[in-house]
Amino acid sequence: MLYLPKKLFLFFFSCIVVIVNYNNSDFVNAANSIGFVNAANSIGLNYGLLGDNLPSPSKVITLYKSIDITKIRIFDPNTEVLNALRGHRDIAVTVGVRDQDLAALSASEEAVKGWFATNIEPYLSDINIAFITVGNEVIPGPIGPQVLPVMQSLTNLVKSRNLPISISTVVAMWNLEQSYPPSAGMFTSQAREQLVPVLKLLSQTNSPILVKIYPYFSYASDPSSIRLDYATFNTEAIVVQDGSLGYSNMFDAIFDAFVWAMEKEGVKDLPMVVSETGWPSAGNGNITTPDIAGTYNRNFVKHIASGKGTPKRPNKGIDGFLFATFNENQKPVGTEQNFGLYNPNDMKPIYNLF
């Protein structure tokens, strides 16, 4: 997860103009203190590996089991992680295709078959692989056009094998040229060129698009103009009125702006999975504290668990993944290193989630 300033500007401008050695008991204790035990079934966790002090994958999987996490997302087919997941079919795994592999894979179906045989096939009998994501926020961009052919090849492959694996991609909100009010949501011209064909393929296969939604970045761009309670699900009052639809939190507004943009391109009722959301606990002064991060993530969990959906899609449950399991010290210095729920050294929670 890395946001480039130029792309941040394009999205946030439209947003802010208007919005005034461990044993099992150790793991269980950690689980109870972070609070996921009672609400995890709707929530997944991103499992990043950009750190030199991370616990072993086997310890991480034990942690996930102890806190009832049943969905995880990994960014590439890491063999150590996948081997640790063997036998844990109660955990649905989303596996990413690395961005740097897209060029070679987009060249031919044979290349995709080779990738699948190496990275997925050896684990099919032992691991519940639910999703393969092709690229991580590369649409729109120079390698964006490589996503669709790889998705098509993987879709053909899993269909021919009758495998229950969904093929999708992960996109960020800079695909939106306009996002406020939500009903004005529309894609950029480059997104229409690169993303819309992907969305239409997903409609045909009834597979969701995975989207990153980070109210934190909108808030951080202008904290004096955007209400913190609106950004953190911490008010029930309507802050943004969009025709007949009222919004009490920024997450729903961003989500629905993307829904509106899809509908304007003739893509209706396509499911959306939140591939990432979260709030850093440090790295940007007093707007990134454990208290604020805990508030956002607690309220996000409650929002997802409620099943109430968004104003545009009421009573339609949302699947979501929190970012991230651990603070990762090899990510860029600042907030990027501080999105984790746990410290990697002692595996203790950074804040209580409930």
Swiss-Prot record:
Transmembrane segments: none annotated. GO terms for biological process: carbohydrate metabolic process; defense response. Keywords: Glycoprotein, Glycosidase, Hydrolase, Plant defense, Secreted, Signal. This is Probable glucan endo-1,3-beta-glucosidase BG5. Its main location: secreted. It catalyses: Hydrolysis of (1->3)-beta-D-glucosidic linkages in (1->3)-beta-D-glucans. It is found in: Secreted. It holds the Pfam family Glyco_hydro_17. It comes from the Eukaryota. Its EC number is 3.2.1.39. Glycans are attached at residue 286. The keyword Coiled coil does not apply. Residues 1-30 form the signal peptide. Belongs to the glycosyl hydrolase 17 family. The lineage of its organism: Eukaryota, Viridiplantae, Streptophyta, Embryophyta, Tracheophyta. GO terms for molecular function: glucan endo-1,3-beta-D-glucosidase activity; glucan exo-1,3-beta-glucosidase activity. The gene is BG5. Gene3D superfamilies: Glycosidases.
